[in-house]
Amino acid sequence: DGEIVGRICGIINQIAKEKKKNKKVRFGWFDFIDDFEVSSTLLNAVAEWGKSQGMEILNGPVGFTDFDHQGLLLEGFDYVAPMASLYNFPYYSTHYENLGLTKEADWIEYQVTVPTKVPEKMERVAQMILSRNKLRIDKVKNAKEIMKKYGYSYFDVIDAAYQPLYNFQPLTKEQKIYYSTLY
């Protein structure tokens, strides 16, 4: 009837496919009305496309990179979602189950009250760690100053820190350039 009832994006990370022999087709931006025919048609389209490209596993919801939103909200619908999180309607989880999708990892968010002053003991431990490891805190005003001072090596630190995280893929040079322009 010409009415938009859903959307989905299929993504193949060519670097992961070639270097790690990763056979996952990623899906994201998966939104749909509460109609199983719609959700199954959308997901099956990505699955079939992925198979035609040699992929064997559906992985999502994720984005183009690991810095994009990912995951499915399963509880906590009565709270305001943080800006860095995805939001979806409660019926999504039923659709995912009916589509045969299973949870592979848990992402848990907490609300933390930050104290107005750093506790004295924490300050002492921090100073001890800095001293022992010959580290320093470099104060910068903004992301542009970080880029000017450190260039793209800044992203090497991010890649190293994120490496142990679920499903992480290091950033390409092009992605580093792109993200450096956002801030």
Residue ranges and their predicted role:
Residues E3-N13:
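Conserved beta-strand in the GNAT
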Residues I11-Q14, W29-D31:
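Asp/Glu-centered strand-loop micro-motifs enriched in Gly/Pro and often flanked by an aromatic residue
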Residues K19-G100, A105:
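Acyl-donor binding region in acyl/amide transferases
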Residues T41, A45, S153-A160, Y178:
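A non-catalytic, amphipathic alpha-helix used as a structural packing/dimerization or gating element
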Residues L86-N167:
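Acyltransferase donor/substrate-recognition loop-hinge adjacent to the catalytic core
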